[in-house]
Amino acid sequence: KNWRNGKERGPVPTAGELERALFQLAPRDLAESWDNVGLLVGDCGREIHRALIALDVTAGTAAEAKEAGAELLVAHHPVMNCNWSPVQTLRDDSQQGRLLLQLVRDGTAAICMHTNLDAAQGGVNDALARRLGLEQTAVLEGGGGIVRMGLLPEEMPLPAFLALVRERLRPNGIRFADGGRPVRRVAVGGGACGEYFAAAAAAGC
């Protein structure tokens, strides 16, 4: 039954089915080799009636999912990454252990879509480019398949571009270096992306 109005609806998807559906949007093979994506916690066969979407899986978002009656938490950043911090024990005297145990005890599955969603067509960086109003967008050569490049509708001085970024993206803060020239060609990359600065500069961004 539909939880809103009690009317009949189609079959309820399982966590495993939702993982496969999300991988159709952001294929697993687009993820960086060090990344950890997909259904990271939970029962593949668990029926999912309600899901909560968050940037991170934290104690707070896990508690919010439980309170909302959501059986699934879909997040961008991986709840665990064996390349960064291998999980060797599952104990309640570590922050990560407490979080994973909280998810298991609450019956909350966790699907994480990270660099594969950054790189996917229509994913994070395409969304950033659209939000900034970039035109003629393309994947930046040398940008790891993640970074997007495009043109502003018109050239603008750096202060005006910074104001546009503040208005459209509402960041907590902005770090910038004044190159002494107006802005037209822009590269966007969610996350660090520092290793792609040289490629962006070479492309005229």
Where are the regions a protein language model picked out?
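Hydrophobic structural segments
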Residues: K1-C205
